[in-house]
UniProtKB/Swiss-Prot annotation:
PANTHER family: HOMEO BOX HB9 LIKE A-RELATED, HOMEOBOX DOMAIN-CONTAINING PROTEIN. This is Homeobox protein vex1. It is found in: Nucleus. GO terms for biological process: BMP signaling pathway; determination of ventral identity; negative regulation of DNA-templated transcription; negative regulation of transcription by RNA polymerase II.
Length: 282
């Protein structure tokens, strides 16, 4: 093998040159093995580096062109490795899976609907049983009202007596007393609000814990008389002219004051305010 000077042209020719022997023991060539066949050309660019033969893609291109020309197409490598079913098989399998899932979902829906219907029916039955209202007669209501006036919180002995007399269960009597207490509370609150806006607190009549005074309201409270109210109609008069002096106000017994739920809302505490002139802007 003759030695040539290394140049760019020689390197390009050597890279484009087709190797004659691809299966060559390059290690033996480097070590100077004399068994190598003579007159062979090797694709060697540099002594320290060996350029391996580049694969020839022309045969592959010709093979693909023949397949395309004949109407065939070579399958890719991943298709060769993994088997993929045909589209028709996919569609049929998908249809069967969809049908099976639809049937199972319909069955589950039917079962769920039946369960919900059973639950709703049971809940309705329980509500109907719990919401059963007791219709009291006039005699029963009269006896219950009489017992409520005596004591708003019924005891066990009174409950047993009423259940025997009125032929009612103790739970029915207990429920009636609870509802009656709530009604009494609402009536008392409404009366307080109405009395607050009217200027005089009037207690709730008809029960022993709120005794009513035995005297007339107009005679004992002359503050509400028309003569005194006419004097208070002056818009910018002094305050002491509209309020009566404490000596003219009638003395109310202390026992009656204690019977009121809120005695501070009476007209009398207004007299404790200091007397001063009202401011007149004009």
């Amino acid at each position: 093998m003759e030695k040539r000077p290394y140049s760019v042209a020689w390197l390009s020719e050597s890279s484009q040159r087709k190797p004659l022997c691809t299966n060559v023991d390059l290690l033996g060539y480097k070590s100077g093995n004399p068994d190598l066949p003579p007159n062979r050309e090797y694709n060697v660019s540099l002594p320290s580096r060996v350029i391996l033969p580049t694969p020839d893609y022309r045969e592959k291109e010709n093979y693909c062109g023949r397949n395309v020309h004949n109407g065939e197409r070579s399958p890719p490598v991943r298709d060769q490795l993994h088997f993929h079913p045909a589209p028709q098989e996919l569609t049929t399998s998908r249809r069967t899976s969809i049908e099976v899932s639809a049937e199972s979902s319909t069955d589950q829906r039917v079962i769920g609907m039946t369960d919900t219907n059973k639950k709703t029916i049971s809940v309705c039955d329980e509500d109907a049983a719990s919401r059963a209202r007791t219709k009291f007669t006039a005699e029963q209501l009269e006896e219950l009202e009489k017992s409520f006036k005596e004591n708003r919180y019924i005891g066990s002995s009174e409950k047993r007596r009423l259940s025997k007399v009125l032929k009612l269960s103790e739970n029915q009597i207990k429920t009636w007393f609870q509802n009656r207490r709530m009604k009494f509370k609402r009536q008392t609150q409404d009366a307080r609000v109405e009395a607050f806006f009217s200027g005089l607190y009037l207690p709730y009549y008809g029960y022993p814990d709120l005794p009513t005074p035995g005297y007339s309201v107009q005679s004992e409270f002359p503050v509400l008389a028309p003569q005194t109210m006419a004097a208070s109609s002056i818009p910018f008069g002094p305050l002491h002219s509209t309020v009566m002096s404490p000596g003219l106000h009638p003395a109310i017994p202390s026992a009656n004051l204690g019977s009121y739920p809120c005695s501070s809302m009476l007209v009398r505490p207004i007299l404790n305010e200091p007397t001063r002139q009202r401011y007149s802007p004009y």
